[in-house]
UniProtKB/Swiss-Prot annotation:
It is an enzyme of class 3 (hydrolase). Its EC number is 3.1.1.77. The gene is AOAH. Cleaved into a large and a small subunit. This is Acyloxyacyl hydrolase. It comes from Oryctolagus cuniculus (Rabbit).
Length: 575
């Protein structure tokens, strides 16, 4: 992943690293992506928002920049950083807007966007009526004496600005680590929510004792302490039997572990961050959480989500269903997903997995790398950079062997097929992006072209006007899914049973339409690529129903003592 944190700090609104969501983690493609290309995307988005705020509120550009900063929270000095950015860049932006140039011209003039020699000009908006060269020369003349131009030409990077250095470092650490940064006893569980804390895996109930963590078998039936953090401990005074023994023995407790990519982590950029007609202080209340969770929302994901869904649909995550089935499973979840993950680097993710074969309960592991093996940052010939069936076979076998050495006996592993991404273009290409809704000037076709030109597209194979390329990408995805199916049918392992499920997106679309929804409503509005919260919960419902019908043993028994557990322990300490 090529320094995805840099784009996050051009301005606090530049928390739009579309690059971090998918193929940026191809470790065997060094140097193919330049971080300043992400900075260009961020600049164009933020400058567009500033311009639209001035339009909607009939205000000056200076007032709109200050309005944007006023919306941001104080936490992580986001508001302060924003005002400092206005102080540094504001005067030049005002001068340029006075000449009626658009965001593309502003960002090229300030050199956050640069046309590489021999490369096409990358732009989000239609080109000016005058020639681009003439327009850019006029704009550069306006700011040529600006001291800030010396900074942008130095190549020092936004993070060299003193007031942003701390933010940069924190975000960089958050993205780099797949285990909690705040973990006193180093047991891979935390009492802190973000920075890979309990939003990602069950909350620790004693961060000073590494023998206490979610998912372990109870120590002495937890008569004196809650060693597995499921909220069930102590002794029933009526008969002297430990509650854990009385309520959980023989109930087949198990955890849920996801090995996934940005879709599994629930990569999400709220549309209200870019839609000025909806923008307010409330729009950015969740910004600090999003920053420290890598713009992922695992706490609301389809596999390990535990918070109430904002989508207001009745479906729950796999974890919440397992917990409802057996309340002894409380807090036993791990979302080992990462933006950009694929079969090429999944084995390294397993190093952050927490499961002790002797001390812990079995687990259900879902392998769901649904796109990055066919999605990559190459602008030319992306097909040649896709994972081949032979490579996938080798990668997945290595992963399964690693899992076999980690998982307790009685576990289960489900291989999930790749996505059917042609749906994206077919559904979105003519629709307006949130940034284009005010003036009807930015469609998803324009967004896809802009990202593709900069070589930061999450998936150039599917987010492309080239029908042949989309078909080739879908063909390779199908080949890889078939490879996963063959592995599941032919391989056996000592400590787990192995299964395969298709990524049946059409079934989810049909279910959503029965509920009165439209297909485009299942895709993340800002990036135009990821399944959104509704889609993820519908996928969870689909997976649960299929597993329950085909392999009911995977889910374990329903615990008849659930009512008693709730009566004695309430919410079991919450999440």
């Amino acid at each position: 992943m090529k320094s995805p944190w840099r784009i996050l700090v051009v301005s606090p609104l530049l928390l739009l690293p579309l690059h971090s969501s998918t193929s940026r983690a191809h470790d065997n493609q060094p140097g193919t992506i330049r971080s300043d290309h992400y900075t260009c995307v961020g600049c164009v988005l933020v400058v567009s928002v500033i311009e639209q705020l001035a339009q909607v509120h009939n205000s000056t550009v200076q007032a709109s920049m200050e309005r944007l900063c006023s919306y941001l929270p104080e936490e992580w000095v986001l508001k302060t950083a924003c005002y400092m950015m206005v102080h540094v860049f504001g005067a030049d932006i005002i001068k340029l807007f006075d000449k009626d140039v658009n965001a593309d011209v502003v960002c090229h003039t300030l050199e956050f966007c640069k046309q590489e020699p021999g490369q096409p000009l990358c732009h989000l908006y239609p080109l000016p009526k005058e020639s681009w060269k003439f327009t850019l020369e006029k704009a550069r003349h306006i700011v040529k004496q600006s001291p800030i131009m010396k900074y942008t030409r130095s190549g020092a990077g936004i993070c060299s600005l003193p007031f942003l250095a701390k933010i940069c470092q924190k975000i960089k650490l958050a993205i780099k680590n797949s285990v909690p940064i705040k973990d006193v006893d180093s047991d891979k569980y935390s009492i802190f929510p973000t920075l890979r804390g309990y939003h990602w895996r069950g909350r620790d109930c004693n961060d000073s004792d590494k023998t206490v963590y979610p998912g372990r078998r109870p120590d002495n039936w937890d008569a004196h302490r809650d060693s597995n953090c499921n909220g069930i401990w102590g002794v029933d005074p009526k008969d002297g039997i430990p509650y854990e023994k009385k309520f959980c023995e023989g109930s087949q407790p198990r955890g849920i572990i996801l090995l996934g990519d940005s879709a599994g982590a629930h990569f999400h950029i709220p549309p209200e961050w870019l839609t000025v007609s909806q923008m307010s202080v409330n729009s950015f209340l969740n910004l600090p959480t999003a920053v420290t969770n890598e713009l992922d929302w695992p706490q609301l994901s389809g596999t390990t989500g535990f918070l109430d869904s904002a989508s207001k649909i009745k479906e729950n995550s796999i974890y919440l269903r397992l917990r409802k089935r057996n309340r002894c499973n409380h807090r036993d979840y791990q979302n080992i997903s990462k933006n950009g993950a694929s079969s090429r680097n999944v084995k390294s993710l397993i190093e952050s997995l927490s499961r002790n074969q002797l001390l812990d309960h079995p687990a259900i592991v879902i392998y769901a790398m649904i796109g990055n093996d066919v999605c990559n940052g190459r602008k030319t010939d992306p097909v040649s950079a896709m994972t081949t069936p032979e490579q996938l076979y080798a990668n997945v076998l290595k992963m399964l062997e690693a899992l076999n050495s980690h998982l307790p006996t009685g576990s289960h592993v489900i291989l999930y097929g790749l996505a059917h991404g042609a749906f994206l273009w077919d559904t979105l290409h003519s629709r307006y992006h949130p940034l284009g809704q005010l003036n009807k000037d930015v469609t998803y076709t324009q967004l896809y072209s802009f990202l593709g030109c900069l070589q930061v597209s999450p998936c150039p194979g599917w987010m492309s006007a080239n029908e042949t390329l989309r078909a080739l990408t879908s063909e390779r995805a199908q080949q890889l899914s078939e490879t996963l199916r063959k592995i599941a049918a032919s391989k056996k392992f000592t400590n787990f049973n192995l299964f395969y499920l298709d990524f049946a997106f059409q079934e989810v679309v049909e279910e959503w339409q029965k509920m009165g929804g439209q297909p485009w409503e299942l895709i993340e509005a800002v990036d135009g690529f990821h399944p959104n919260e509704v889609a993820l919960l519908l996928f969870a419902d689909q997976l649960w129903e299929k597993v329950q019908r085909q392999w009911p043993d995977v889910l374990g028994k329903e615990n008849p003592f659930n009512p008693q557990i709730e009566e004695v322990f309430g919410d079991q300490g919450g999440h």
